[in-house]
Amino acid sequence: MGSLVLPLSAVFCLVAHSASGSPIMGLEQSPLEEDMPFFDDIFTEQDGIDFNTLLQSMKNEFLKTLNLSDIPVQDTGRVDPPEYMLELYNKFATDRTSMPSANIIRSFKNEDLFSQPVTFNGLRKYPLLFNVSIPHHEEVVMAELRLYTLVQRDRMMYDGVDRKITIFEVLESADGSEEERSMLVLVSTEIYGTNSEWETFDVTDATRRWQKSGPSTHQLEIHIESRQNQAEDTGRGQLEIDMSAQNKHDPLLVVFSDDQSNDKEQKEELNELITHEQDLDLDSDAFFSGPDEEALLQMRSNMIDDSSARIRRNAKGNYCKKTPLYIDFKEIGWDSWIIAPPGYEAYECRGVCNYPLAEHLTPTKHAIIQALVHLKNSQKASKACCVPTKLDPISILYLDKGVVTYKFKYEGMAVSECGCR
């Protein structure tokens, strides 16, 4: 049996209807439900399709879009995302006119939690370790190292602390010996610190190089030195990097990348919307020779002008339309790895597509013919289906193997418009 593909928004419609426990929606049963089979009724009518198998395949489709092979297994306990990642999510979730520089943003935390900074002749060194994994098909747009600088000074005597900060990449020797390691300068800048705050360093080139090498661990070393000689700098204050474990000011490597999948996904969504049409045989033996273009346009015109009681009756509530459907990630057991949002309004398309089809439902030529055939002989063709014709994306903040990841536009998650197909 060939694979069955449905719009991604249908994943959560199915999960919502099949989830155990309290219902996701508190809506009363609509009168139109008498005329509409539930999902499991629909699929059991089709030979060889198992509902549970279908549901699992659709969940897999959702995970595949996020480049996940399975629901990420998380450590026990809730993971607190970096403050910066929450700020990004809230910024773009509340202001839809804002656009991030990339569709995917990942944050990698410092993995070296035991090494301590070392000071020698006025030079202070901080070791950092990042386990970086970025899919090869993504384009790294930008990468930045975020360090929280702690400024300690006598506010009565000095305006600030003058320091030079250099970011080195520690390159391992061929034989792995520490004596033969070399240091590559990634970025160097001068900072006049007046208050404790975040400082950002561009490490895009290095991150692109790391991406090509595949998932691997990379060691950095931060050097902080005074711009004055040691005698002049004595007592002027200190500038340090906050390295406290489990601190909201942990060093953070933030990678902005583009999966270049928007166009591809939108085309796939369009194909998914009309997949069921390809299964309907409209040859001359099973049905009738379809009308030519002129006759079809006339048929459409007649439908628009028709003011019969049927149209008025259908317009009262049971015609195809967008209805509320709130998805709560906790209800379906995905709150362990989806950080934000806790849920979202996905909407769904409900109702019937009786002939004649209204213009606002933007029916295809095929749907018009199918509705007409069903009207003449319901045994030959089923009614046209009420389905999403336009889908909107949502933003999502989630955990992928311990890496807090933000995806600005996860396509096909919310119904924008419904129609008959």
From Swiss-Prot:
Signal peptide span: 1-21
**Which residues are connected by disulfide bridges in this protein?**
C320-C386, C349-C418, C353-C420
Positions annotated with a glycan in the UniProt record: N67, N131
Q: What is its main location?
A: secreted
Recorded GO cellular component terms are:
cell surface; extracellular space; Z disc
Q: Where in the cell is it found?
A: Secreted
Instruction: Mention one GO biological process in which this protein takes part, according to its record.
Output: ventricular cardiac muscle tissue morphogenesis
The protein's UniProt keywords, in alphabetical order, are: Cell adhesion, Cleavage on pair of basic residues, Cytokine, Developmental protein, Disulfide bond, Glycoprotein, Growth factor, Secreted, Signal
List, in alphabetical order, the Gene Ontology terms for molecular function in this entry.
Answer: cytokine activity; growth factor activity; hormone activity; receptor serine/threonine kinase binding; telethonin binding
Disrupted-gene phenotype: Mice die in utero between 9.5 dpc and 10.5 dpc. They appear normal at 8.5 dpc-8.75 dpc but display cardiac dysgenesis at 9.0 dpc-9.5 dpc with profound hypoplastic ventricular walls and absence of ventricular trabeculae and have a significantly lower heart rate than wild type embryos. Mutants show up-regulation of Cdkn1c/p57KIP throughout the ventricular wall while levels of Mef2c and Nkx2-5 are normal at 8.5 dpc-8.75 dpc but are down-regulated at 9.25 dpc-9.5 dpc.
Return the InterPro entries for the record.
Cystine-knot_cytokine (IPR029034), TGF-b_C (IPR001839), TGF-b_propeptide (IPR001111), TGF-beta-rel (IPR015615), TGFb_CS (IPR017948)
> What Pfam families does the record tag this protein with?
TGF_beta, TGFb_propeptide
On tissue specificity, the annotation reads: In the embryo, expressed exclusively in the ventricular trabecular myocardium of the developing heart from 9.0 dpc-13.5 dpc. By 16.5 dpc-18.5 dpc, only detectable in atria. Highly expressed in the adult heart where it is found in the right atrium but not in the left atrium. Lower levels in adult liver and lung.
Q: Give the propeptide positions.
A: 22-313
Q: What does this protein do?
A: Required for maintaining the proliferative activity of embryonic cardiomyocytes by preventing premature activation of the negative cell cycle regulator CDKN1C/p57KIP and maintaining the required expression levels of cardiogenic factors such as MEF2C and NKX2-5. Acts as a ligand for ACVRL1/ALK1, BMPR1A/ALK3 and BMPR1B/ALK6, leading to activation of SMAD1, SMAD5 and SMAD8 transcription factors. Inhibits endothelial cell migration and growth. May reduce cell migration and cell matrix adhesion in breast cancer cell lines.
Q: Which family is it part of? A: Belongs to the TGF-beta family.
Q: How does it assemble?
A: Homodimer; disulfide-linked. Interacts with FBN1 (via N-terminal domain) and FBN2. Interacts with ENG.
The protein, known as: Bone morphogenetic protein 10
Tell me the classification of the organism that encodes this protein.
Eukaryota, Metazoa, Chordata, Craniata, Vertebrata
The protein's gene is named Bmp10
